[in-house]
Design a protein with these regions (language model features):
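Acidic, amphipathic alpha-helical patches
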Residues: 9-10
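FMN-binding flavodoxin-like domain, especially the glycine-rich phosphate-binding loop
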Residues: 1, 5, 14-114
Length: 114
């Protein structure tokens, strides 16, 4: 079952088999709401080790937020990553939307153990 959330409490992250974070790059960084969830999860010692993590996002000029998200998921939480992250300049085109679908499919296959 796929559940789309615009906000998740840190303890809800532990219930998921996989987490895909979406964050635009804002002033060369992850957006504050995504950062807050990660920081709250870290403070609460939410166990995400071995869970599957991925990231996507948009940017206007720099685009590093998706890589930063993956760094936190790997280094702080010990998650298994699906790489590379998807970073899109402004709005996705048809090919980039297809990349997003493939990312979702890859995550689902990893959950299923394929």
């Amino acid at each position: 079952e796929v559940v789309l959330k615009y906000y998740a409490r840190p303890e809800e992250l532990a219930e998921a088999a996989a987490i895909i974070f979406g964050s635009p790059t804002y002033y060369h960084d992850i957006t504050l709401p995504i950062k807050q969830v990660m920081e709250e999860a870290a403070k609460a010692n939410v166990m995400l080790k071995g869970k599957i993590g991925a990231a996507f996002g948009s940017y206007g000029w720099s685009g590093e937020a998706t890589k930063q998200v993956l760094e936190v998921l790997k280094n702080r939480f010990g998650m298994t990553l699906v790489e590379p992250p998807i970073a899109v300049l402004y709005e996705p085109n048809k090919e980039q939307l297809e990349q997003c679908r493939k990312l979702g499919k890859t995550v689902a296959e990893k959950i299923a153990g394929k």
